[in-house]
Amino acid sequence: MNRIVEVNRLTKEYGRDAAVKDVTFAVEEGKIYGLLGRNGAGKTTIMHMLTAQLFPSSGELKVFGENPYENNRVLSQLCFIKESQRYPDSYRVLDVLKVAASIYPNWDRDLAAQLLEDFRLPLKRRMKKLSRGMLSSVGIIIGLASRAPLTIFDEPYLGLDAVARSLFYERLMQDYAENPRTIMLSTHLIDEVSNMLEHVLVIDQGRLLIDEEAEDLRGKAYTVLGPRAAVESFTAGKNTIHQESIGGMMSVTLLERLDPGDKRRAEAQGLEMIPISMQQLIVHLTQSKSNGKVAEFQ
Amino acid sequence: MNRTAGVMKIHWRDKWVWMYVPWVVMLFSFAVNLVIGILTRGEEPINSGGVVTIYVYMFVAILIVQAQTFPFALGLNIRRTDYFVGTSAMALLVSAVSSVLLFALGMIEQFTNAWGVQLHYFHLPFLKEVSPLGRLGIYFIVMIHMFFMGFVISSIHRRFGRTGMFVFFIALIVLSSICSFAMTYYGLWLDFFRWIGAHYMDLFLWMIPLTVIYALLSYVLLRRATVS
């Protein structure tokens, strides 16, 4: 597989604080990536650095094999839709789309027109007067119609209603199937997108926690539920990411591939094995460590 | 598509800020002066400085334009270099058009005998000696000089933020205080104004290298500017 993004020990510091610390990963061509994590985890900072809008403090960064900084060969293949994008005050929706059409080399006029209708955007309205959801729709239209080989969406649907969101997923998947490209998606609504994601990167407090195929990750995360003693003996020595107990019952969440033998053993001991959703998994992983300790003491 | 042209397109969508606003303001001021001239039947000569507004506006325009379009352009993955070149090209174009218009209005003023009411608005008395081509050149040079002066300041703000602005203006104030003190101390003020009175034409020429320096500084600053 062709690697279109290579990031090596990427770090971004603001004074003494590190927003991103020693992050290393690669992005392969033609897949949908999810960049997940809590607010302030460093997702947006990473995306800003990938698109050369921010400068790394240290580390290596290659996009399409080259440094993206002031490099049109790289930048012309990118489209970065961010929640914090600002527009000139006098611009109307129409102006933004006209400019985007002249700047993105692969711009699809028909698709843009179709999306405009789907999202019911008022063409003549000023960007300043748009609601949060409409503003997000403009970003989504640009992100999809630009057909950039690497499209990055950062919280693309803030303020969008459920109908518009499912419209976005539908259009994204449809267009992705017809025009394969690489998509990086950062979002809080993990459950909604978890089925689309092919690869998951989880960032917490500036560090990369998980870099795995979504399929593998889904098959690895389980909650084991049953009587305390049985659960404890079964999960001993395994990679535990969360535990809770109520009375004599205990539930432990594991992140580890279990072999069939393990599963049989669990069944024989009357333990229940429940696969957990990606959202739950990420909540467990990124809950602050101190909380985890409090839970242990209980 | 060429990305510098893309930047110019971004600016061109904002024709109001670039072209219409300064001209509407200045022509309005001209109209007021003209009405006064007509009401006084041209008995008193009016030497209006109204044409200065368009020059001050050029300085202000880039402050507004850069604050709004730089984050937008970078958001569309435009290179900083392309932004700089496209914006400068737009400024040269707008300055050229405005200078030609000012020049043409000055000519009309000359031929209509100061609009028939002794209103000297576009044809400035101190440029009487200058050839028409020289006058056109001066209009243009002063305008792009104003533009790039604003460009440097907005680029300092872009690159170093509010703190940078603060430091810059403190330094500027301290420096000009020292200069002004030295001038007073050595009794040079009169000589200074005498020199200006005799050499003001040279000042226009000096604006050319100054403008080049402003432009280079703006470029260097923008190359390291970020958006979030």
List each language-model region with its residue ranges.
Chain A
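Conserved ABC transporter NBD signature motif
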Residues: 59-74
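ABC-family P-loop ATPase nucleotide-binding domains
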Residues: 80-138
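Walker A (P-loop) phosphate-binding loop of ABC-type ATPase nucleotide-binding domains
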Residues: 37-42
